[in-house]
Amino acid sequence: LTSGYHQAPIHKNCQKYTAFLTPFGLYEWVRLPMGLAGAPSYFQRVMCTEVLAGLHAIICFLYLDDLIVTGRTEEEFLHNLSRIFQRLREKGLTLNPEKCVLGACEVEYVGHTLNSTGLHFERSKLDSILDWEKPSTQKQLKRFLGVVNWFRDHVKNHSTIVKPLNALLRNYSKTLKIQWSQEANEAFEKIKRAVHECPRLYFLDDVSPIFMETDASQYGIGASLYQRIDEKTVQAIAFMSK
């Protein structure tokens, strides 16, 4: 979308809460600005429940102003694309042609590489994790965990692996030095390897049999969903842990 937020109107009764002072007087936003705490969730709700109602999660998927349209065949894709264009036209929304990619078999979407078989991460992103130096402060560790948590849906038993690292964030202080234990050191190296080796996640093909593996300990629980393509090939569908 072109300046997506600015295409979302703010209710007249709420405009006063967006007021800001300038040398020329007090102004209020009539369209959604960047920076409001509730802007992302409001924009997502408007797009999913009003603009793309009946289409979202059926023929298209949306993350804020990034929209992806799908189709099993070229004809189906063009039909779905026409429906999306018609809906956006009806709602008065515009697209940025320079940022649009049409008819691609593989696209970069919300940090993932996505195609007809599934999704994965660029190898360069995974390789960079192995080079991450061990954090010396809680602030540095928190940043590291924020990065590896982005990959959690691709890592089996993620929560159990990082538990010793999360424990180091107790009594949080940005400058507090970390006292690394052997368990924490092992967890740090293990999560780096797990992220680096994280598998591609495949879409269900509606034909191959599926099976689930579960695991539990005193620290957490986990589940893994797979589909068996043949006697030698098993594909990962999803991982969950908490």
Where are these regions (language model features)?
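Retroelement reverse transcriptase polymerase core
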Residues: 1-242
